[in-house]
Amino acid sequence: MVLNSNYDNYKNKITNSMKPLINSVNPAFSNQENPNSVILTTFNDFTNWARLSSLWPLLYGTSCCFIEFASLIGSRFDFDRYGLVPRSSPRQADLIITAGTVTMKMAPSLVRLYEQMPEPKYVIAMGACTITGGMFSTDSYSTVRGVDKLIPVDIYLPGCPPKPEAIIDAIIKLRKKIAQETYKDKSKFQQGNRYLTLNHKFHFVSNINTGQYNKQLDTKISNSQFNSTLDTFIPIKKNENLTFLLKNEDNKENIENKSKD
């Protein structure tokens, strides 16, 4: 067996490359005696790292912007590398991306979905129609001019529609925002008051589903009113019957006269 003279040098290079590299300026460990599996960190940094690495968005698309968001699921952009897992239930999501136009009828459903999400939760307003109402903001009576009138927004993503690269950039900015949060900022997770503009006057009414569906008629209408309506209704029916009978008798007489002739 013949060995090359460079074999020993190659073996030494491999053993040297397998040694852990430690930065002399800002070491990752307290000292070199600690094992490589132990990393010193803080509670805030650990929780922030866990949350920003596992953002689960809620699929909420109402317009053409959702097509651009759906393209992120493919292999070309592959947003799974950021830890994003699409969810269909708001109770399992901590991020909602409002992609598309928000109408007046969709506004209560959107607020309900947001309130069902666990804390902490984040919102990305995607597209011009979501941020300002878009082309429907001038003469439309059924479009909400900005989703921030309903729920608090963390990241605004303009465009009509935004490109998938812009969505990834918005997610990266949101990850940086989460990384800078502290545990003392928990109070900001509380839902604040939503201020509505004069253009959108929402009238909050009580719930109509009272469960009392088998009410008697006399509870709504008094007996006197019910009898008065019957008194006015019965003579009309009698008169109609009399006129119908008279018409039939006249027709019979005409038929008999024609037969005699």
UniProtKB/Swiss-Prot annotation:
Q: Which GO terms describe its molecular function?
A: 4 iron, 4 sulfur cluster binding; iron ion binding; NADH dehydrogenase (ubiquinone) activity; quinone binding
Q: Where does [4Fe-4S] cluster bind?
A: 64-65, 129, 160
Q: How is the cofactor bound?
A: Binds 1 [4Fe-4S] cluster.
List, alphabetically, the GO terms of the cellular component aspect: chloroplast thylakoid membrane; respiratory chain complex I
Gene Ontology terms describing biological process = aerobic respiration; electron transport coupled proton transport; photosynthesis, light reaction
Q: What is the protein's major site of localization? A: plastid
**Entry keyword annotation includes Nucleotide-binding:** no
Identify the EC number(s): 7.1.1.-
Give the protein's cofactors.
Answer: [4Fe-4S] cluster
* InterPro entries according to UniProt: NADH_UbQ_OxRdtase-like_20kDa, NADH_UQ_OxRdtase_20Kd_su
In terms of Pfam families, this protein maps to: Oxidored_q6
Q: Where in the cell is it found?
A: Plastid, Chloroplast thylakoid membrane
UniProt superkingdom: Eukaryota
Q: What chemistry does it catalyse, as a reaction equation?
A: a plastoquinone + NADH + (n+1) H(+)(in) = a plastoquinol + NAD(+) + n H(+)(out); a plastoquinone + NADPH + (n+1) H(+)(in) = a plastoquinol + NADP(+) + n H(+)(out)
Q: Provide this UniProt record's keywords sorted from A to Z.
A: 4Fe-4S, Chloroplast, Iron, Iron-sulfur, Membrane, Metal-binding, NAD, NADP, Plastid, Plastoquinone, Quinone, Thylakoid, Translocase, Transport
Task: Give me the disulphide-bonded residues.
Answer: none
Instruction: Look up and give the membrane topology term.
Output: Peripheral membrane protein
Sequence similarity: Belongs to the complex I 20 kDa subunit family.
Q: What does this protein do?
A: NDH shuttles electrons from NAD(P)H:plastoquinone, via FMN and iron-sulfur (Fe-S) centers, to quinones in the photosynthetic chain and possibly in a chloroplast respiratory chain. The immediate electron acceptor for the enzyme in this species is believed to be plastoquinone. Couples the redox reaction to proton translocation, and thus conserves the redox energy in a proton gradient.
HAMAP family, from UniProt? NDH1_NuoB (MF_01356)
- Quaternary structure, from the entry: NDH is composed of at least 16 different subunits, 5 of which are encoded in the nucleus.
Protein name per UniProt: NAD(P)H-quinone oxidoreductase subunit K, chloroplastic
Q: Which organism is it from?
A: Physcomitrium patens
